[in-house]
Design a protein with these regions (language model features):
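Sec-dependent signal peptide recognition
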Residues: 2-8
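C-terminal motif of bacterial Sec signal peptides marking the signal peptidase cleavage site
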Residues: 15-16
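N-terminal beta-hairpin/loop module of FHA
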Residues: 33-77, 224-228
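Forkhead-associated
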Residues: 56-122
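Surface-exposed beta-loop interaction hotspot
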Residues: 128-195
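Extended, aromatic/histidine-rich regions of cofactor-dependent oxidoreductases associated
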Residues: 159-160, 250-252, 256-294
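Flexible, glycine-rich surface segments
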Residues: 173-229, 234
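C-terminal soluble interaction/assembly domains
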Residues: 232-246, 250-252, 256, 262
């Protein structure tokens, strides 16, 4: 990211280099790279826009389909009344298809009944019927049925979000330090129940004479809340990634790369919210806004 930015920094008696944010001069190559990142982000949103159902498995027999008599009702055009059910017992989680309903696994093999094994990530294998697919996921120790529809009207209806103008005030030279051991922390989630996530290190930067820090997750993942949250930006905060150094050291912290989490455009997601220590007490006028593109 740094190679796209020319840094001019003039030291004064009261300001150090890391705070003179407006001395970042943005080249055309920087703008091009940022816009390309946003295009890729828009393409990746399709998998969330396909989501059409999220249901907690809290019964022994959990039937699903279009009919109102199902435990879980799917509002999908031309869907069969009932696809099948996910049955819970003390020893097993099993999907049973309705007779004469074609259901396949990831290998394209037709199945009538199958045990659903939960993997290390808390997910079962995916199953398919026409344009829909589903799997069981785990959140906060609870099992949920998640359903996708590749023809979901939401895919075409969603036009994207507007962003703030590219703002060099919110590009910082920050210091990143790895924690001695990975920290596991409980955070709030879209489901309304706490969930756990891990943090591997911390960013430190200065803005208008004040020191700030942000805890960073695996892969450089950062959840951020600020005083625009719930006003011009999504109330549950925004996400971004940083390029992690191999060892403790300087990194570029560019808030122009902030983006809305999936919960901002799909009700069937399970986003995590920023922890308390990642709530910034200033208005971060950079990155994606909540207003949708017309």
């Amino acid at each position: 990211m740094k190679k796209h930015i020319l840094i001019g920094c003039f030291l004064t008696l009261f300001l150090n280099c890391k705070e003179v944010n407006k001395q970042y001069h943005l080249e055309d190559s920087y703008v091009k790279a940022l816009n390309e990142n946003r295009k890729i982000r828009a393409k990746n949103r399709v998998k969330y826009l396909e989501l059409t159902g999220l249901f907690k498995l809290d019964s022994t027999t959990n039937s699903f389909g279009k009919a109102a008599s199902n435990q879980f009702v799917l509002s999908i055009k031309n869907l069969v009344p009932r696809i099948g059910s996910i049955d819970l017992s003390k020893n097993e989680l099993r999907f049973n298809a309705v007779k004469d309903i074609k259901v396949t696994n990831t290998f394209g093999e037709e199945i009538q009944t199958i045990a659903l094994h939960i993997d290390a990530n808390g997910n079962s294998a995916q199953l398919f019927h026409k344009q829909i697919k589903w799997q069981v996921i785990t959140r906060s120790g609870e099992l949920y049925l998640r359903v996708w529809d590749s023809k979901n009207p939401a895919i075409q209806a969603f036009k994207g979000f507007k962003s703030y103008e590219i703002n060099n005030e919110f590009i910082f030279d920050a210091e990143f330090s790895y924690f001695e051991t990975k920290r596991i922390e409980t955070v709030e989630s879209k489901l309304g129940i706490p969930d756990v996530t891990d943090f591997i290190g911390q960013l430190q930067f200065r803005y208008k004479g004040k020191a700030f820090s942000l805890d960073v997750g695996s892969g450089g993942f950062v959840m951020v809340g600020d005083l625009t949250s719930g006003e011009t930006t999504y109330g549950g905060g925004r996400y971004m990634y940083i390029e992690l150094p191999k060892t403790n050291g300087s990194v570029t912290l560019d808030f122009n790369y902030l983006y809305n989490p999936p919960c901002a455009y799909s009700e069937f997601t399970t986003c995590l919210y920023p922890p308390r220590q990642n709530q910034l007490d200033f208005r971060l006028k950079a990155g994606e806004r909540l207003e949708e593109t017309l």
